[in-house]
Amino acid sequence: MANVNGVEIDLMPNEGMRTEAQRYRDWKADGEAGGTDVARTRASQILSGNELSADTVVTMSAWFARHEADKQGKGFSPGEDGYPSNGRVAWAAWGGDAGKSWSDARSRRIKKAR
């Protein structure tokens, strides 16, 4: 449990996030493109078994907001040509849909506590 100005906030990644981060690693091992060095670091942080920092959680929420449009791209969803697209691979590195909802909720709490 992280303490943000006296407010306890659980910043431990959840199982859905870990599943997506592992999917990212599996895709990369298979030679798929997508994701930056930061994405690789984020997947490692999610899979580490450690809590994320408050700053990382706020950064994650902002990243998902910027990349929401990637979900409309060709190859984002299973069964589409080009799956997984570069955007889908990167989305997984950051924890996927589970990471988006998790980081959005916690980011709001962190910002309120600050």
Tell me the role of every PLM-derived stretch.
Residues M1-R114:
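Extended terminal accessory/targeting regions
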